[in-house]
């Protein structure tokens, strides 16, 4: 069941390589990445948000390798 759901998505391959030569010579990739985020072509998936004081819990969750997105650490301004 789950395999058929995964294969039903339409995937598009995009190669992105902002190495030092390319990035300094051509800054179009910055605008292109911004456009991808605005249009929803690329999505940032957030799994959980932790307070910085709960860093041990966040790292132990990351160590389980069950995260389905990014782990965000809220940091206070000192």
UniProtKB/Swiss-Prot annotation:
Gene3D superfamilies: Medium-chain alcohol dehydrogenases, catalytic domain, NAD(P)-binding Rossmann-like Domain. Pfam families: ADH_zinc_N_2. It comes from the Eukaryota. Partially overlaps AST1. This is Putative uncharacterized protein YBL068W-A.
């Amino acid at each position: 069941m789950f395999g058929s759901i995964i294969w039903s998505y339409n995937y598009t391959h995009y190669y992105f390589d902002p190495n030092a030569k390319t990035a300094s010579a051509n800054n179009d990739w910055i605008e292109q990445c911004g456009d991808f985020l605005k249009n929803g072509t690329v999505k940032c998936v957030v799994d959980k948000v932790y307070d910085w004081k709960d860093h041990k819990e966040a790292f132990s969750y990351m160590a389980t390798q069950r995260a389905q997105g990014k782990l965000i650490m809220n940091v206070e301004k000192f």
